[in-house]
């Protein structure tokens, strides 16, 4: 929320400096993000009037102007295209100082003397508009200091509001809080009802009362939209970061900023019959004010006439029914209350974000619509003329928000704030916020909440308000005390921090990505799986809960590659969300992605790129941390996001633990990845669950090693061969490793060669050759019988 300080002080004016006001607002939870002066630093500039102009004798783009300062007439040479007799403009006389320490002196331009300068808005740093002189109102007093006339000793204050404080998205809401903070009265503009000058109405029919419990409309005839918006209103809008468009739009925006009620003005001539507030028809088309055509969904509330949709309710109006300064003569003015849930997320789902949707999503006072209607009507009549008709209202009382009283206990206040608060002070602070308190017992109140404080429904909400007004910085510091009994952790169970350190030691960097992703990205990684969609997403490309950590990691990988980071190794730990709300599983996972060279750049390091076995080694390091690496098996498998020939399924005692492999070529193409990328993802609970190591004394006796060259079927997994060897190698086997795999010349195309090293060591004696040879023969017999694997000849 951005607003003019002077506008706020017109409502409530505590006798404090700007800096003190800003600091107090921030301490009260209305955090001030920025304070921007309304104009640059300048002096000596007054309201001037151009009395006459003539063409410069030696320059086509310059004009010689006679300018009145209210006391004298000066000759000024000006190049602005809109310099003409009769307009009033900022006039910098000789001796004036413009922003940037630019001093005005007598000058001669192409042989003609100039005694001053006529200024644009950009030259005074009022705005960035630099297409001509800043034209002032016709009744601007000539000779008055321009800072005084335009109230430029002002500042734009921007507040970063939390979503629950939608009531402060207006000058009225901010004034209520400032009044309570400083115990200063609010001077609210008097808004009398405008008497009807004619009886023309357009009937209003609401077929979705739960989404729109209140709708007000009024016909205003014979308006003149060619009249300009008053400069004072344009300036207040500008300082609130709202661009002036035309009088009708400016007035509805002004009322929204002032009171907090979004409004809309339709061109009455474009409305066929009456107004219908209904749900859209699936696929119904609407061209919006920004020129974008959207296909509406059936869950979208629209304002329509008897033939077509005119606007997305609470978001944006349609182009064909919008006001036009050249052809619009009659208006239909709308002021309505839409339930936040009916508007929430709709703007983002259509790729929009408007001031109206921003307010309706957070909540608007359900009792404000009529006051806003009368305020906007009066401003329209004052500025563009016209005659107002009667107000037509459609209301469903049963669907309007019902605010229940809240019970507040002194005991709970003390417990949460760490201090006792005087009952009189409690009542005074709450009453200052227009909350009505009634004693309902000893140390207890029943508090009635006004309609504009839709964020207050619980006792803790009231205590938060007390803390805000009392001052968080004034609360005593009381450290909580608790008797804690440390809970022992099983020795067999590891922890996530150690796994994270292990991956960092292996060259990874930790990434933290959003749990919600683009539904299109979800479909790429998990085709055919129904995503869990958010009801109110941050944006349309963050609408699905992730079923894997891979989408976020791959997007982070792309981000790094786009910034010339060729060697990327990222990991993340977090939840994945599988299923729908009824059977949703939130499963802790750990995942990683790698690409680029195997080793960092260095004179002794090669430039080999990473491959499948690099990521497998990283996964084995994680699994080995548990002390139970032998419990895990790797086997060829399939995953829609992984390469069909480079995918491993990881299991533990027959239970799926995770996957690793190269990214699928089609997926890589869809994501624009032109290099090998390898991924892994593991169920965290299975990785950290291990077993205690068993102590065995180091043997003093020599090891015995045998190497076997085996011929196995092409489709026989090496893990199956190793497992069978281990089962038949006896209890003194201390090491078993596969150190070579060969396919090619001298080997049948359907077969492969595996080189395996076996090491035995007895703890109390030396093993003899007969024992080892007997064991080897048992191994070879089992391999031939069960896996058709034989010794290579």
Swiss-Prot record:
Catalyzed reactions per annotation: tRNA(Phe) + L-phenylalanine + ATP = L-phenylalanyl-tRNA(Phe) + AMP + diphosphate + H(+)
Lineage, broadest ranks: Bacteria, Pseudomonadati, Pseudomonadota, Gammaproteobacteria, Pseudomonadales
Chain ranges of the tRNA-binding domain: 39-147
Highest rank taxon of the organism: Bacteria
GO molecular function annotation: ATP binding; magnesium ion binding; phenylalanine-tRNA ligase activity; tRNA binding
Protein name (database record): Phenylalanine--tRNA ligase beta subunit
GO CC annotations on file: phenylalanine-tRNA ligase complex
Compartments where found: Cytoplasm
Protein keywords: Aminoacyl-tRNA synthetase, ATP-binding, Cytoplasm, Ligase, Magnesium, Metal-binding, Nucleotide-binding, Protein biosynthesis, RNA-binding, tRNA-binding
Enzyme Commission number(s) of this protein: 6.1.1.20
InterPro entries in the record: aa-tRNA-synth_II/BPL/LPL (IPR045864), B3/B4_tRNA-bd (IPR005146), DNA-bd_dom_put_sf (IPR009061), Fdx_antiC-bd (IPR005121), Fdx_antiC-bd_sf (IPR036690), NA-bd_OB-fold (IPR012340), Phe-tRNA-ligase_IIc_bsu (IPR045060), Phe-tRNA-ligase_IIc_bsu_bact (IPR004532)
GO biological-process terms attached to the record: phenylalanyl-tRNA aminoacylation
Pfam families: B3_4, B5, FDX-ACB, tRNA_bind, tRNA_synthFbeta
Domain FDX-ACB: 699-792
Domain (B5) ranges: 401-477
Enzyme class: ligase
Cofactor: Mg(2+)
Classification via SUPFAM superfamilies: Anticodon-binding domain of PheRS (SSF54991), Class II aaRS and biotin synthetases (SSF55681), Nucleic acid-binding proteins (SSF50249), PheT/TilS domain (SSF56037), Putative DNA-binding domain (SSF46955)
Cofactor binding description: Binds 2 magnesium ions per tetramer.
């Amino acid at each position: 929320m951005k607003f003019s300080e002077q506008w706020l002080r017109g409502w409530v004016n505590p006798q404090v400096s700007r800096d003190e006001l800003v600091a107090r607002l921030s301490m009260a939870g209305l955090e001030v993000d920025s304070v921007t002066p309304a104009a640059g630093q300048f002096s000596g500039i007054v309201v001037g009037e151009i009395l006459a102009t003539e063409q410069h004798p030696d320059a086509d783009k310059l004009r010689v102007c006679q300018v009145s300062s209210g006391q004298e007439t000066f000759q000024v040479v000006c190049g602005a295209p809109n310099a003409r007799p009769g307009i009033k403009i900022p006039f910098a006389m000789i001796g004036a100082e413009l922003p940037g320490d630019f001093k005005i002196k007598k000058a001669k331009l192409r042989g003609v003397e100039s005694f001053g300068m006529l200024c644009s808005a950009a030259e005074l740093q009022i705005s960035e508009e630099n297409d001509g002189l800043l034209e002032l109102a016709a009744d601007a007093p000539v000779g008055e200091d321009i800072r005084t006339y335009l109230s430029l000793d002002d500042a734009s204050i921007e507040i970063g509001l939390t979503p629950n404080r939608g009531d402060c998205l207006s000058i009225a809401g901010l004034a209520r809080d400032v009044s309570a903070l400083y115990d200063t009265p609010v001077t609210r503009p008097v808004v009398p009802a405008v008497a009807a000058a004619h009886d023309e109405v357009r009937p209003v029919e609401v077929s979705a009362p739960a989404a729109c419990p209140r709708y007000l409309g009024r016909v205003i005839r014979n308006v003149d939209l060619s009249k300009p918006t008053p400069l004072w209103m344009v300036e207040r809008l500008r300082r609130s970061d709202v661009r002036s468009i035309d009088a009708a739009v400016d007035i509805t925006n002004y009322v929204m900023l002032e009171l907090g009620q979004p409004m809309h003005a339709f061109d009455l001539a474009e409305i066929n019959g009456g107004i219908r507030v209904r749900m859209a028809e699936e696929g119904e088309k609407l061209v919006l004010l920004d020129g974008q055509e959207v296909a509406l969904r059936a869950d979208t509330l629209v304002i329509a006439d008897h033939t077509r949709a005119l606007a997305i309710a609470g978001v944006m109006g349609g182009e064909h029914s919008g006001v036009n300064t050249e052809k619009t003569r009659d208006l239909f003015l709308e002021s309505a209350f839409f339930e936040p849930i009916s508007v929430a997320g709709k703007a983002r789902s259509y790729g929009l974000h408007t001031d109206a949707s921003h307010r309706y999503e957070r909540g608007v006072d359900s009792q404000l619509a009529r006051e806003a209607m009368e305020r906007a009507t009066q401003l329209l009549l004052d500025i563009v003329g016209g005659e107002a008709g009667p107000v037509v209202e459609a209301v469903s009382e049963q669907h309007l928000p019902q605010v229940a009283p809240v019970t507040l206990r002194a005991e709970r206040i003390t417990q949460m704030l760490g201090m006792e608060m005087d009952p009189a002070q409690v009542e005074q602070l709450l009453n200052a916020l227009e909350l009505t308190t009634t004693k309902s017992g000893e140390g207890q109140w029943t508090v009635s909440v006004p309609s504009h404080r839709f964020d207050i429904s619980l006792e803790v909400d009231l205590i938060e308000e007390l803390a805000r007004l009392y001052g968080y910085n004034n609360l005593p510091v009381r450290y909580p005390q608790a008797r804690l009994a440390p809970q022992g952790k099983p020795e067999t169970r590891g922890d996530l921090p150690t796994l994270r350190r292990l991956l960092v030691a292996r060259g990874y960097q930790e990434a933290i990505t959003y749990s919600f992703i683009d539904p299109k990205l979800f479909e790429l990684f998990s085709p055919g799986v129904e995503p869990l969609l958010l009801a109110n997403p941050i944006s349309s490309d963050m609408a699905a809960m992730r079923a894997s950590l891979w989408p976020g990691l791959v997007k982070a990988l792309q981000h790094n590659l786009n910034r010339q980071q060729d060697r990327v190794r990222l990991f993340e730990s977090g939840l994945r969300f599988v299923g729908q709300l009824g059977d949703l599983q939130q499963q802790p996972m750990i995942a990683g992605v790698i690409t680029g060279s195997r080793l960092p750049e260095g004179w002794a390091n090669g430039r080999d790129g990473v491959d499948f076995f690099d990521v497998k080694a990283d996964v084995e390091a994680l699994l080995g941390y548990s002390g139970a690496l032998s419990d895990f098996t790797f086997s060829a498998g399939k995953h829609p996001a992984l390469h069909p020939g480079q995918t491993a399924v990881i299991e533990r005692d027959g239970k799926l633990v995770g996957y690793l492999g190269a990214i699928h070529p089609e997926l890589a193409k869809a994501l624009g990845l032109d290099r090998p990328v390898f991924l892994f993802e593991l169920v965290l609970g299975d990785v950290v669950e291990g077993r205690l190591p068993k102590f065995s004394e180091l043997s003093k006796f020599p090891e015995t090693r045998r190497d076997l060259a085996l011929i196995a079927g092409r489709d026989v997994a090496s893990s199956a061969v190793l497992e069978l060897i281990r089962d038949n190698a006896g209890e003194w086997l201390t090491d078993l490793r596969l150190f070579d795999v060969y396919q090619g010349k001298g080997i049948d195309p359907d077969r492969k060669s595996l080189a395996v090293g076996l090491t035995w060591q007895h703890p109390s004696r030396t093993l003899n050759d007969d024992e080892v040879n007997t064991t080897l023969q048992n191994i070879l017999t089992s391999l031939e019988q069960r896996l058709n694997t034989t010794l290579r000849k």
